[in-house]
Regions:
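Short loop/turn motifs at secondary-structure junctions and domain boundaries
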Residues: 47-51
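Asp-based phosphoryl-transfer active-site loop
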Residues: 55-70, 260
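Secretory-pathway/luminal and periplasmic proteins that interact with or process carbohydrate-rich
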Residues: 66-68, 108, 192, 199
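C-terminal cap/substrate-recognition subdomain and adjoining C-terminal extension
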Residues: 19-25, 29-35, 39, 54, ...
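A metal-dependent, Asp-based hydrolase signature
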Residues: 70-71, 76-155, 159
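Short, solvent-exposed loop/turn elements at domain surfaces
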Residues: 43-45, 66-68, 210-211
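Ser/Thr-centric signal marking residues that sit
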Residues: 4, 64, 175
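Gram-negative bacterial Sec-dependent N-terminal signal peptides
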Residues: 1-18
Length: 333
């Protein structure tokens, strides 16, 4: 009897010590809704069961899996690349947009709008082989840190969302990124950061040019045939790259609304929708209708209420924002 009691105690202690797969989430209705949907979708005896081959789920990246404020990380990469490359390009010397970048005059850069952004993207994302571009992104990720948090960008994935990705995969779901960010940029880091392989990452892209070389072959990036994977283009990209309608969608802005509506209208299965609402100025940023750069969230909140989607209140629903082992918490002063 004594041994039995000791054994029961050990089992109890071990069970109590086991970490919850969503330990970075507070025990709120948002977390409970996730767990309930996953349970029902994976229970073969439940009317909401989804066969494993149909368990495709899609995530936005900027603002959903990692921060997009005060500017997106890819835009920061563009600015840093212009500064790094400028000495090699004397023809840029009299360009007012480049001068603004070199002076950290972000107001002038922002005022240049989409036309200015495309120009900077042409300077940093075209007429370069895909292999060289990947090396540049990897080097930047390994050597640059976020100005506010002092962490490397690849350490700033939201811990609750990274846990959610793992949790879904453990339950037989296939996780995809469908984002307005550059497809090549995200593919460099997606597997290491999120466990999502490059072939399951879809983003904005332009056509490349193939050619043979003395050492084999290469693809050079161009700005031709650019496709902006945002808003109404997201469902189009899902159709082109995935070939089937998702059963769950996770986003944070009105730019994700079409993707979520496309998912919600899946005629065969009970779907799930979740929006991350940035409400934590102390641990991250707080915005919706007036974001620092991208991520406006107005219409999405209205539709979420109508459709019964989960709206995550970052301040209340997340126990941690970043993994403290990688990016120790820093609150606003």
């Amino acid at each position: 009897m004594k041994r039995t009691l000791i054994g029961m105690l050990l089992v109890s202690l071990c069970g109590g010590a086991a970490a919850s797969p969503l330990s970075a989430w507070n025990d709120t209705p948002a977390k409970q809704a996730i767990e309930t949907w996953v349970h029902d979708a994976t229970d073969a005896n439940n009317h909401a069961f989804i066969p494993p081959e149909k368990r495709y789920v899609v995530f936005d990246n900027d603002g959903t899996l990692w921060p997009e404020a005060p500017i997106t990380f890819q835009i920061q990469f563009v600015l840093d690349e212009v500064k790094r490359l400028a000495p090699e390009h004397p023809e840029w010397q009299n360009d007012p947009l480049v001068s603004a970048v070199l002076k950290n005059d972000l107001k002038t850069v922002a005022a240049a709008g989409e036309k200015g952004l495309l120009k900077l993207l042409a300077f940093t994302h075209s007429d370069i082989t895909t292999d060289e571009f990947n090396k540049r992104v990897a080097s930047w990720i390994d050597t640059h840190k976020d100005a506010r948090f002092g962490c490397q960008y690849n350490q700033m994935g939201y811990q609750p969302m990274r846990q959610l990705l793992d949790y879904l995969r453990e339950n037989g779901f296939k996780t995809w990124i469908i984002s307005g960010g550059g497809i090549d940029f995200m593919r460099v880091l997606s597997e290491k950061m999120y466990g999502i392989p490059p072939e399951q990452v879809v983003g904005s892209f332009a056509l490349g040019e193939f050619s043979l070389t003395k050492d084999g072959s290469q693809i050079r990036k161009t700005m031709q045939g650019a496709f902006n994977d945002d808003a109404a283009n997201k469902p189009v990209a899902i159709h082109l790259f995935m070939g089937q309608r998702p059963v769950a969608a996770f986003g944070n802005s009105d730019g994700d609304l079409a993707m979520m509506q496309y998912t919600a209208s899946n005629p065969d299965y009970k779907t799930f929708g979740l929006l991350v609402h940035h409400t934590d100025a102390a641990r991250e940023y707080a915005y919706d209708s007036h974001p620092p750069a991208s991520g406006k969230l107005v219409e999405g909140l209205k539709v979420a209420k109508e459709k019964g989607w989960v709206v995550v209140d970052m301040q209340k629903d997340w126990k941690t924002v970043f993994d403290p082992a990688q990016c120790p918490a820093k609150t606003a002063q």
